[in-house]
């Protein structure tokens, strides 16, 4: 196998685009703090809806990857590269599965529901929590975003290493 299955490639790039949007809307919400409450609520809803969408896509991606497999790294790839690639992929999957759930819990803990793109309410059992609990979830979500950003930077650095330094065809696995 020289490339990932077409469904995996599609989900990979769709997820990448959605993550960029998550950081865009998340940054806008946090750093520009819109004064218009309706606009602010819409930004939060878009960010949260995209987060839930990413979570579903990652679940689908895991199922498809288990069913279709993945191309192997070249046999001459150093052992350290193999270990780092595996750890980075596992960590990315873990964060992409946990981060949206923490975000949803964060939203709910402050007493807000999530209406997925205004189409239906996403159920969540925790409901409004004391402010200190809600703030802990907010902090966890922020640290999760920072962790995701660092993992994505490492993932991109790995892709650049394979594409520009080793020139070993690994980048074509996802192209």
Where are these regions (language model features)?
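Membrane-embedded alpha-helical bundles that constitute the cytochrome b-like, heme-associated redox core
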Residues: 1-175
